[in-house]
């Protein structure tokens, strides 16, 4: 998870160096997601309907050995030369083997 964020952040910063305004990924409304999602109820089909296809898909394994499908959504935008205005947000969602949301975490822009 941390490696993915590092890779996305690095790609974002490299892209910012290539032109004056750069957008990476597809923007999403975190507040709208949080108001809709219900752990143990919401399905992959519903999440895809709200947010579209994930930017990345993988597998996470917890300390007890349980495996989860993990979907990642990210969005970044920035403008040179003032890098202080660059924004990056990442949402990672974990699903159980039945495709139901078990949990999620995000970084970047909050509510």
Could you describe each region identified by the protein language model?
Residues 20-111:
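Residues within mature, well-folded domains
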Residues 15-18:
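C-terminal motif of bacterial Sec signal peptides marking the signal peptidase cleavage site
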Residues 1-8:
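Bacterial N-terminal signal peptides that target proteins for export
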């Amino acid at each position: 998870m941390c490696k993915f964020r590092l890779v996305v952040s690095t790609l974002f910063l490299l892209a910012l160096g290539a032109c004056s305004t750069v957008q990476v990924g597809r923007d999403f409304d975190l507040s709208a997601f949080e108001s809709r999602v219900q752990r143990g109820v919401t399905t992959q089909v519903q999440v895809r309907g709200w947010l579209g296809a994930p930017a990345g898909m993988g597998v996470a394994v917890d300390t007890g050995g349980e495996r989860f499908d993990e979907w990642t959504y990210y969005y970044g935008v920035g403008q040179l030369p003032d890098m202080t205005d660059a924004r990056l947000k990442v949402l990672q969602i974990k699903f159980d083997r039945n495709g139901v949301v078990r949990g999620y975490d995000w970084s970047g822009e909050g509510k």
